[in-house]
Regions:
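N-terminal alpha-helical modules
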Residues: 33-275
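Bacterial N-terminal signal peptides that target proteins for export
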Residues: 2-26
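Compositionally biased, intrinsically disordered low-complexity segments enriched
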Residues: 20-34, 179
Length: 275
């Protein structure tokens, strides 16, 4: 009965998480990306519908829904990254390439960390939790890359004058063409790479790192000794990703990255060793 209760609670939490994440910046990978995502992203809607299906009501079915959703977000990651390589200015392109390399390295090491943590637990509800923790960083990355790709997308092609000869007004009266991100085509671009202060000079960053270290140490104490290197490796890879990405998203975005990591570390520290 206790296991069934945990599964039911996990299903409700997953459904609530999809609704919350679709419309909230929250503790997200990049705050700007989450602020710009539509309140009802089709991928989130599809996941919510999948989780509600009767033939997916079992833990295995719920995990299957999350796996399919992760694949869809990964496709967004791949597509947005290719758009960035095509459209972004040289400095932004180099920055996002470095960020993506570090993100991929972190994700590989993070898979080993999740396995090490969930190997200390028992019960199908924890398998669902592990699947969710693998999904969310991919979603965060997809939103961040999609927002960046939209920012650098070329403006739509100008309408030929002849095609507008019968329309009211003239081309000179028309407002500047809007870019996909909603800004006029002739508007100055935001700086591709920002200067960010060291974290110890940024009070918000320093406070966030304090909280992160607290949960990191709690998890370290609960992990088996033979898994210590796995935790250190995953955290070191995440730090590399954070530092490579911070100049692209600014100090506020860096705090959002740390916030997402705090949420993960808190969850893992509360999960490790549960039976």
């Amino acid at each position: 009965m206790a296991t069934h209760g945990r599964i039911q609670a996990m299903r409700a939490a997953l459904a609530a998480l999809v609704v919350w994440a679709a419309g909230s910046a929250g503790l997200a990978g990049v705050g700007v990306a989450h602020a710009e995502v539509a309140a009802a992203d089709p991928i989130d809607v599809a996941m919510r519908q999948c989780l509600a299906r009767r033939d997916r009501s079992s833990p295995a079915g719920q995990i299957q829904c999350m796996g399919e959703t992760q694949q869809q977000w990964q496709a967004v990651v791949d597509g947005a990254y290719q758009r960035l390589l095509k459209d972004a200015p040289a400095d932004a392109k180099r920055g996002w390439q470095d960020s993506q390399r570090h993100w991929l390295t972190w994700r590989k090491d993070e898979v080993h960390l999740l396995k090490a943590v969930y190997d200390t637990t028992r019960g199908t509800s924890y398998a669902m939790s592990s699947a969710d923790l693998q999904l969310q960083p991919v979603r965060d990355r997809a939103l961040a890359l999609r927002a960046a790709a939209d920012r650098y997308a070329p403006p739509p092609a100008a309408v030929p004058v002849a095609a507008t000869s019968g329309a009211q007004g003239s081309a000179s009266d028309a407002p500047s063409a809007a870019k996909p991100n909603g800004k006029p085509a002739n508007a100055p671009r935001d700086p591709a790479v920002r200067r960010v202060r060291p974290c110890e000079q940024d009070a918000a960053c320093e406070h966030a790192l304090f909280d992160l270290n607290r949960y990191y140490q709690k998890l370290r104490r609960k992990m088996p000794a033979h898994s210590a290197a796995t935790l250190v490796r995953a955290q070191r890879a995440w730090v590399g990703f954070r530092d490579a990405t911070a100049p692209l998203v600014g100090e506020g975005g860096r705090v959002d990255l740390i916030g997402a990591r705090i949420a993960t570390m808190k969850r893992l520290s509360e999960t490790a060793g549960n039976q």
